[in-house]
Amino acid sequence: MSAITEIYAREVLDSRGNPTVEAEVYTQDGGFGRGIVPSGASTGEHEAVELRDGDKDRYMGKGVTKAVANVNDIIAKEIVGYEVTDQVAIDKAMIALDGTPNKGKLGANAILAVSIAVARAAADELQVPLYNYIGGFNAHVLPTPMMNVINGGAHSDNKVDFQEFMIMPVGAPTVKEAIRMGSETFHHLQKLLAADGKVTSVGDEGGFAPDFANNEEPLEYLIKAIEAAGYKPGKDIAIAVDVASSELWDNDSKKYKLRWSTGEEFTTEEFIKYLEGLVAKYPIISIEDPIDENNWDDWVTITSELGKKVQLVGDDFFVTNTEYLRKGIKMGAANSILIKVNQIGTLTETMEAIEMAKEAGYTAIVSHRSGETEDTTIADLVVATNAGQIKTGSMSRTDRLAKYNQLMRIEDQLTDLVAKYKGINSFYNLSEQARQDIINK
């Protein structure tokens, strides 16, 4: 193998037109890799630090020239000379160079851009696909997609409290067919909304964000769209929601408030019953962040009450951090973790979180951010780790479709003999009976 000879970073733009960090890595024998970092809109308070300039006269304070300079002036000097395939050592060297628990000195956006670029340069030098380089010959599971077709909460300007309403083609035989089913349902949803005079412009993640009367109306539209596309709700396409409850939690009153819709308030016990009612009524298979990120005991409560029926995903709760995940596993909080590479800041730490989850029987869902780029690393990562589920937006916007297109390419490369799409069985954190209940709902 050959050594890294050059690392260079620049400021580019994400899908929202905000600056982000792009890094390039070059090797002695001609290997080349590029990594671009995404950015979130609703972020967990314990996430690794995304370093921004804060200069209000430039990009309204969102510039990343400091992070870029940290790559070019500090990280490059440390990492040039490393063997490009020594990913773990390189990631650990950058973590040590930063020296803070949250990567606040150099910026997780600076470190992650280099981490991704290094992996891509190594794959390029070895002339193998990225998923193959990261996961070896065992990489073969194509993920069940979570397609965010209706946006609410912090991701929109409407009167819907839940942040995301998603469809999951759990009955598809392949990822290609899953994407087709999702696309058809998306277009039927658009027709249904338009016929009712609702706005069909799309939000950050490619989903629709019209006004609805309450949080159940989007679910009713999803059922209608699934049926209009010729599929059976539950059996063919299940529903997932991201409550993003930290946005609803009021720490003073200790209640959840439907702040975007009715203004109704719930105690934790009442809010759990509210969610339980939705699960009983609709073919919901997954709920993300149903409880505020700092209320650990309440997470244990909802897991004991709902965790055998549906997937309970920790996003802001775990922030892709093995320390928080380890605590959650020990306490019995949640049964799934959302994996966002920029929440933790290196590929090595990301993969450690995925493996820890799988060993504990938790599912790991590899996820995009609301501010995305053309970088398709997460599509390769989800296959490399056989994680089984991916969350990467709706059926519109090139930054989202780039990941779906990459998954279809990977499925072709693996061929039908090797590639495996598990659909409903990707929910190995739920019992066979629970999965059947979703299918039969």
From Swiss-Prot:
One of its GO terms (biological process) is glycolytic process. Binds a second Mg(2+) ion via substrate during catalysis. It is found in: Cytoplasm; Secreted; Cell surface. It catalyses: (2R)-2-phosphoglycerate = phosphoenolpyruvate + H2O. Its cofactor is Mg(2+). One of its GO terms (molecular function) is magnesium ion binding. This is Enolase. It comes from Ligilactobacillus salivarius (strain UCC118). The lineage of its organism: Bacteria, Bacillati, Bacillota, Bacilli, Lactobacillales.
